[in-house]
Structures are given as structure tokens and as C-alpha cells.
């Protein structure tokens, strides 16, 4: 009797590539004519998975976010992996913007994905684990159909499919 096939649905970010994009962004800020004397800074806290942008004005912070976004895209990081807060007033008339790197699938999103897969009426079993989902079925074709379906959906964060067996 054939064993069930399965795969995991995860949301992970390669922090080394994020760090590389961050380094490229700081280099561009220090060299770009319109940004180098503005006093704008960007910091990355790897432990908290947090970007902190300090800028003299809101439009400068948006320019830095655009630079960082272009560097992240070139490094293969989906922009949905970074959740930006609204700009906040900081000391000295500056603006601070925080960007959180989103990893793992939270329970609400996992339940929504589970419901969407169940609504497809495929013979698959979905198990919600801590920060990922395991989808299993006797039919590999059903698993491929689920992968194609999930790629077409938008859950506000990037999804990867790993551990395909």
C-alpha cells in the first residue's frame, strides 16, 4: 500500500540575504547625492528582525524604503516579508519608521489557509503545526493542485513549500 505524500507550507526569510540587502542599502545611502548629507540612517536588529529608519522628513524615509525594497527584490526576498509601521515623530524633528520582518504562519492565517484548502474539495489532510502547515494526501496530483492554488492566493506574507515527500 502506498504511503501518503506530504509537504509543508512555511513562511521563512533568509536573514543572510536580508543582511546583504541592508548592507547594500547603507552603502547606497552613504553614496547617493540626495541622501548622503540628509542625516538619514537605517539599522537592522537581527535578533528582533526589525528595520529602523531615522530620517529628517517623511519623504526621505520613503526614499530609503524604496532603496531597501529594490535591494530586497534583487536578493530574492518577497516584499510581503517586511511589514512597515506608520511613520512616527522622533526627537529633533525627525521621523522614525519601523519595519518588522514577518516569519512563520500565525494561527489566524493558518486557519484561513486550511479553510481555503478544504473549500477546494480535494482529498488532502491539512495539519496546523506551530508556525507551519503540513498537507498530506495519497495523491501527488492533489498536492500539486494545492501548491498551485496557494501560489495564486494572497495571505499577506510569502509562502514557501518545503519537505515535499
Regions found by a protein language model. Name each.
Residues 19-34, 68-69, 106-118:
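Short amphipathic alpha-helix segments
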Residues 5-11, 48-55, 92-101:
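Short, hydrophobic beta-strand segments
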Residues 1-37:
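N-terminal, positively charged regions that mediate nucleic acid binding
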Residues 60-98:
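Helix-adjacent hinge/juxtasegments
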Residues 17-18, 59-64, 105-109, 142-143:
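Short, conserved charged micro-motifs
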Amino acid at each position: 500500500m502506498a504511503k501518503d505524500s506530504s509537504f509543508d507550507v512555511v513562511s521563512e526569510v533568509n536573514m543572510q540575504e536580508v543582511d546583504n540587502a541592508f548592507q547594500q542599502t547603507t552603502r547606497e545611502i552613504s553614496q547617493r547625492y540626495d541622501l548622503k548629507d540628509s542625516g538619514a540612517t537605517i539599522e537592522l536588529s537581527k535578533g528582533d528582525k526589525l528595520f529602523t529608519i531615522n530620517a529628517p522628513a517623511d519623504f526621505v524615509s520613503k526614499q530609503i524604503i524604496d532603496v531597501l525594497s529594490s535591494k530586497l527584490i534583487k536578493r530574492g526576498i518577497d516584499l510581503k516579508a517586511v511589514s512597515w509601521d506608520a511613520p512616527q515623530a522622533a526627537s529633533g524633528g525627525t521621523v522614525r519608521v519601523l519595519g518588522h520582518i514577518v516569519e512563520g504562519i500565525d494561527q489566524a492565517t493558518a486557519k484561513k489557509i486550511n479553510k481555503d484548502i478544504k473549500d477546494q474539495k480535494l482529498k488532502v489532510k491539512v495539519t496546523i503545526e506551530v508556525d507551519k502547515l503540513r498537507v498530506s494526501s495519497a495523491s501527488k496530483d492533489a498536492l500539486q493542485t494545492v501548491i498551485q492554488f496557494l501560489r495564486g492566493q494572497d495571505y499577506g506574507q510569502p509562502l514557501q513549500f518545503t519537505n515535499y515527500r
